[in-house]
Swiss-Prot record:
Protein name: Co-chaperonin GroES
InterPro entries assigned to the protein according to its UniProt record, in alphabetical order: Chaperonin_GroES, Chaperonin_GroES_sf, Chaprnonin_Cpn10_CS, GroES-like_sf
GO molecular function, one term: metal ion binding
Pfam family, one: Cpn10
Recorded family membership: Belongs to the GroES chaperonin family.
The protein's assembly and partners: Heptamer of 7 subunits arranged in a ring. Interacts with the chaperonin GroEL.
Chief localization: cytoplasm
HAMAP family linked: CH10
Gene Ontology biological process terms from the UniProt entry: chaperone cofactor-dependent protein refolding
Keywords for this protein: Chaperone, Cytoplasm
A cellular-component GO term for this protein: cytoplasm
Location(s), subcellular: Cytoplasm
Amino acid sequence: MKIRPLGDRVVIKKIEAEETTKSGIVLPGSAKEKPQEAEIVAVGPGGVIDGKEIKMEVKVGDRVLFSKYAGNEVKIDGVEYTILRQDDILAIIE
């Protein structure tokens, strides 16, 4: 199934945090931080919001950092994605 976000929304797939610390300690699921790094899976067309034209600055395949509690989580074909607005993306990782 293909997903096509509307407006200035993007669909991301979170990149899970490491399960082992640098010193080799294995973290249980409850101790891991909520992931804030993701890969862009789909990008909306942009559009006009509050009278301002919104140009999409991200593209499919970009790795990004996003606000920890941003967006709506959805499950499609057994895979978890998050749909959020471009404004919730903090940076592109190059």
